[in-house]
Amino acid sequence: MLLLAAAGWWVDAPYVLAVPVAALLAYWAFARLDLYMGVVLALVPLSINLGELGLTSVGWYMPTEPMLFALLLLSCARWLSGKRLDRTLWKHPVTWVILAGFVWMGLTILPSSHPVVSLKAWISRAWFMVAFYFLLAAWFEHSPKAQTRFLALLLVPICVVVTYTIVRHAGHGFGKGAGHWVMKPFFKDHTSYGAVLAMLLPPAIAMVWRKHKTALARVLWGLGVVWLSVGTVLSYTRAAWVSLAAVGALWAVMKLGVRLKPLLAASVVALGGLALSWDALVVQLERNNQDSSDNFTQHIESISNVSTDDSNLERLNRWSCALAMFEERPFWGWGPGTYQFEYAPFQTSTLRTRISTNNADLGNAHSEYLGPLAEQGILGLLAVLGLLAATLH
């Protein structure tokens, strides 16, 4: 392999350098799946969508999605040859909910408004499910240190992306406008970037305080926490900030010893009170005219502005479209991955904003619940809620 790499460098053919790397990855996929998965995890934050850069018509994130697709084919071949996963994993409620949701997602391809798009979304879901649920679960079960390695393999490249983003952002004075795109090409926009940072921050904090850690390990994890925190703040992603506040509140409730059933009961009561006072709440929200801003205090205040803030109003527009789409196709939905192609006719003039579009190029329903409801019908929503319930239980 070293000779092949040297030959590629000598004849000025850089693509030849990839051959020994591909050969090594292929060997690991068959003989050392843990090393192969480690490479995939480390490359996830660094992957680039070549389609968005105009370099290819295929909208895959390179190089991870081709690697995941290869892993899907290899795993299917292994299972067909008789190799089975651990029975305890198959019997786990989360596994059953995930598989039920996956089967239903496949069935909704048949009446989809865009069958090819839905089929691609379903196959994509398959390789994520196989790699990041079944194979990771098996890795975690057989290796006591796998969880720590998993987080470290994600945290290090994420910190590289945060550094890249902050350096670019600094060149634009850390303004809110630039904060929406300086993370490209690694992330599509600031919302996905902020969401990933927010999801990694709590487990990274937990690793700092985990027992039996050396002083050096605590310092390194602590530096990672600081860098993730800086990146989250500078992402100007209000949803990430609110989510972290909610996670902190939930952690405090758990530390106080409150069990799940009383917590769910309190949530139901709170939702009931919200429904009864909805009109008064809307009146109060409409009095908030603070738009999103470079000022962090004003940016936080703008979270509840549903009268003038385009970002918040567009979110309401997307939710309204998702509900209208569900009303038209309540059982089957419009098909996986089709929301962005179908929602435009469901927009109303009262909810359209300056950033609304009919071009099917600006994202999804902005809801992990309403999106499946519109695309996969009522059973799609129940699959998401079932996964949430099984995970919490």
Model-derived features: where do they sit?
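Membrane-interface micro-motifs in multi-pass membrane enzymes
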Residues: 11-15, 57-67, 120-126, 185-199, ...
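Flexible juxtamembrane loops connecting transmembrane helices in multi-pass membrane enzymes
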Residues: 177-186, 276-321, 327, 356-360
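Long extracytoplasmic/lumenal interhelical loops at the membrane interface
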Residues: 305-320, 328, 332-376
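N-terminal hydrophobic segments of proteins, predominantly signal-anchor/transmembrane helices
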Residues: 27-124
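Membrane-interfacial loop-to-transmembrane-helix junctions in polytopic alpha-helical membrane proteins
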Residues: 10-16, 56, 60, 86, ...
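Short, aromatic-rich membrane-interface segments at the entry and exit
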Residues: 10-20, 34-39, 59-64, 217-218, ...
